[in-house]
């Protein structure tokens, strides 16, 4: 009997699939976030040369997350990951104030890409545990997110090691996928 209701439930409320592209400058914490979401563990990482791809399931949403390296030489390859992206997750090291202008430039370059025009934007203001971290409100101004008039976006403070804020971001993605 339980199997019957399980089958009915999955038919009436199927998993929503979301192709997610996670980008940001090198050292922002993208890979640490990916594996915190996937394994609920903090893993030791090395700079990503190329990409990592993992499937993360969260409350009836299946996210295929493409984590692409953020080194300057690799950024030219980002465009090959754009097709069919539902959600763009842009990770910013909120404690590295000197690189925030560079992050803003890369973000706005991404947002100008026609293949990403319909994607939702989730900004993870990562490393909130660092003493000099900028708050999400400060990063909203520094990244000029308020100027984005024709795109759904959300920013939340995160700590990839503890998981703080990550599920808040996924809840926003879930809400966007249902609308």
Curated annotation (Swiss-Prot):
GTP binds at residues 24-32, 126-129, 160. It is a lipid-anchor. Pfam families: Arf. It comes from the Eukaryota. SUPFAM superfamilies: P-loop containing nucleoside triphosphate hydrolases (SSF52540). It is found in: Golgi apparatus membrane. Keywords: ER-Golgi transport, Golgi apparatus, GTP-binding, Hydrolase, Lipoprotein, Membrane, Myristate, Nucleotide-binding, Protein transport, Transport. Alternates between an inactive GDP-bound form and an active GTP-bound form. Activated by a guanine nucleotide-exchange factor (GEF) and inactivated by GTPase-activating protein (GAP). One of its GO terms (molecular function) is GTPase activity. A lipid is attached at residue 2 (N-myristoyl glycine). Gene3D superfamilies: P-loop containing nucleotide triphosphate hydrolases. Residues 3-16 are annotated as: Important for the stable binding to the membranes. Its EC number is 3.6.5.2. GO terms for cellular component: cytoplasm; Golgi membrane. It is an enzyme of class 3 (hydrolase). One of its GO terms (biological process) is IRE1-mediated unfolded protein response. It catalyses: GTP + H2O = GDP + phosphate + H(+). Belongs to the small GTPase superfamily. Arf family. Small GTPase involved in protein trafficking between different compartments. Modulates vesicle budding and uncoating within the Golgi complex. In its GTP-bound form, triggers the recruitment of coatomer proteins to the Golgi membrane. The hydrolysis of ARF1-bound GTP, which is mediated by ARFGAPs proteins, is required for dissociation of coat proteins from Golgi membranes and vesicles. NCBIfam families: small_GTP (TIGR00231). This is ADP-ribosylation factor 1-like 1. It comes from Caenorhabditis elegans.
